[in-house]
Amino acid sequence: MPKIVVVGAVAGGATCASQIRRLDKESDIIIFEKDRDMSFANCALPYVIGEVVEDRKYALVYTPEKFYDRKQITVKTYHEVIAINDERQTVTVLNRKTNEQFEESYDKLILSPGASANSLGFESDITFTLRNLEDTDAIDQFIKANQVDKVLVIGAGYVSLEVLENLYERGLHPTLIHRSDKINKLMDADMNQPILDELDKREIPYRLNEEIDAINGNEITFKSGKVEHYDMIIEGVGTHPNSKLIESSNIKLDRKGFIPVNDKFETNVPNIYAIGDIATSHYRHVDLPASVPLAWGAHRAASIVAEQIAGNDTIEFKGFLGNNIVKFFDYTFASVGVKPNELKQFDYKMVEVTQGAHANYYPGNSPLHLRVYYDTSNRQILRAAAVGKEGADKRIDVLSMAMMNQLTVDELTEFEVAYAPPYSHPKDLINMIGYKAK
């Protein structure tokens, strides 16, 4: 009976173990998770803080006990894999409660340790990061115990924006700072103006090109020279892959600490797979490497690895498109394809349309800005982005399907988009992009 060891019990690891059990009722499967919780909804965490998700239990999908009862898979929380001996096929595990170490053998090893939040490194009792349910509970408890009012949010990526919105909706007074003037880097820079407009509309303070110089209790000194007082600080300054456990092994890492994998999510070492935030693969529609630490990729990788281990080696990963979306107050920001800073590697043209998300005469209409970049050599779509109060998700998903099938920008004229006055136009924005490209 083969023994399968999984490192990490959140989206990638728990899903992969579950899929293996669905296909294989006999294997011995054990998951090691270094933190308190398994199988929680990462994407729900800002909304738990904002009390949009009113009960945190809805963010916790499984407990180890429930997981074992339903799937006969052992999950050990507070157990951190700290080393891998791929020649002996063992892992070294640290019990974080007792500080004891032991070795566990494996026939197949699945690495899904995820990523950790970066920190600016200041010693402060009021500073928090948000990466898991423990962090969420700590933030919520601190707010309640200390009657928090003023919160400094550092960073302007998706998580920071979602946290800021939810703090505001909870009735607190957040302020946003970011070390550069480039916010929400997955979007085109000039399409991010609605973020600043939404902040201005609600009189939420923000400062770009600003950084913290020192923290002394509740007194924050900024590099601009300003000194302000805050009850709480939440850092959203990016993440890094949890790859320290790899250093003892023969597994190759790239210069950023990610594990390169093939189309079966195999590493360079036999019997070891890597999925989720730690793995790097490639785009589907262009020949470029891609690291896309989002939920869809982790779940897709989990399914493919499960099939491989169960004996079906015909299924391979075809690549990422990087489809992503975020809500910020009244606006939705969505994009798909290569990142803005990767476009320079192509000879491309851009075409864009701004018009109502639905028929102009139907009430509640608002502008939707849609932009498409295409390769001039073959006219295939490289990237698309959309911003608006409604309809951005629909258009980006349609364009994602077009890119998946390597359609040209000209073929967008042929798309028969569902039309009724509350939803779109007889010639939708998708069609108009195709006509304008001609």
Swiss-Prot record:
Where, in this chain's numbering, is NADP(+) bound?
Answer: 151-166
Molecular function as annotated in GO: CoA-disulfide reductase (NADPH) activity; flavin adenine dinucleotide binding; NADP binding; protein disulfide isomerase activity
Highest taxon above the source species: Bacteria
Q: Which Pfam families match?
A: Pyr_redox_2, Pyr_redox_dim
Task: Indicate the residues that form the catalytic site.
Answer: 43
Where along this sequence does the record place binding of substrate? 15, 19, 22, 39, 42, 71, 299, 427
How does the cofactor attach, per the note?
A: Binds 1 FAD per subunit.
Tell me which residues bind FAD.
8-33, 267-277, 419
Matching SUPFAM superfamilies, A to Z? Answer: FAD/NAD(P)-binding domain, FAD/NAD-linked reductases, dimerisation (C-terminal) domain
Q: Which reaction does it catalyse?
A: NADP(+) + 2 CoA = CoA-disulfide + NADPH + H(+)
The keyword Membrane is assigned to this record: no
The UniProt function text for this chain reads: Catalyzes specifically the NADPH-dependent reduction of coenzyme A disulfide.
Q: Which family does it belong to?
A: Belongs to the class-III pyridine nucleotide-disulfide oxidoreductase family.
What's in the domain note? Contains 2 FAD binding domains and a single NADPH binding domain.
Q: Which NCBIfam families match?
A: CoA_CoA_reduc, PRK13512.1
The protein here is known as Coenzyme A disulfide reductase
